[in-house]
Regions:
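Hydrophobic lipid-interacting interfaces of membrane-associated proteins
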Residues: 49-51, 77-79, 100, 180-182
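An acidic-aromatic
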Residues: 64-119
Length: 202
């Protein structure tokens, strides 16, 4: 008998708030979430904008997110290009390279920073509670928008993540992380790929 991984069995629960049963948006979200959960690694490039209210930071980086750690290589701006961070599941906000230190500080009480944004986005895609999922048209392309949030918080409160995926390629296109209704992180992704593990069915 084939045994399904627990993570696969949990998918319907994590889609509980997503549209009507059997809708195209729900089916697409199920397929994309399943791919995210079964991926052994995600790679790509991202442009991160972090809004601290009085300060706005912009970074460009390449990333490789595995099951145990995420490796980020900053490519811009020039003052921090070449900085490399290795983040565990707990995440870090301190980067060191040749004695230089970059510390931007947390954006919320949970310690969200520009450095931890990519792990936070991928974690939301894999296992966050899906409040809604809708299909949108943008520049002639069909996209799936996922709104992921804490179901115990009122709408617009706490951390809410909006993720957009290309429905054809399942590539992550962009993301917005909002804290109490204020957008603190924006991510624009390119060359996003998910590497799938090869499994044998007995």
């Amino acid at each position: 008998m084939r045994k399904l991984p627990v993570c696969v069995l949990m998918i319907p629960l994590l889609l509980a708030g997503c549209g009507g049963a059997g809708s195209k948006a729900e089916e697409t979200a199920l397929e994309i979430r399943s791919a995210c959960m079964s991926a052994s690694a995600c790679t790509g490039s991202a442009e991160i904008t972090a809004d601290y209210g009085q300060r706005v930071y912009r970074y460009q980086m390449d990333f490789q997110a595995g099951q145990k750690e995420t490796v980020l290589t900053l490519t811009g701006p020039d003052t921090v290009a070449g900085v490399v961070a290795r983040l565990t599941n707990e995440g870090e906000s301190l980067l060191e390279y040749d004695g230089a230190v970059l510390e931007t500080g947390p954006l919320n009480e949970d310690g969200l920073t520009p450095v931890s944004a990519i792990p936070a986005v991928l974690n939301a895609a894999r296992q966050g509670y899906l409040e809604t999922c809708t299909l949108e048209e943008r520049e002639g392309r069909e996209e799936l928008r996922m709104l992921i949030r804490d179901p115990e918080q009122p709408l617009g409160q706490g951390l809410e993540s909006s993720l957009w995926f290309d429905t054809q390629t399942q590539s992550l296109l962009r993301a917005e992380l909002c804290q109490d209704g204020f957008c603190v992180i924006q991510c624009q992704f390119s060359q996003f790929t998910m590497e799938q593990e090869e499994t044998q069915v007995k």
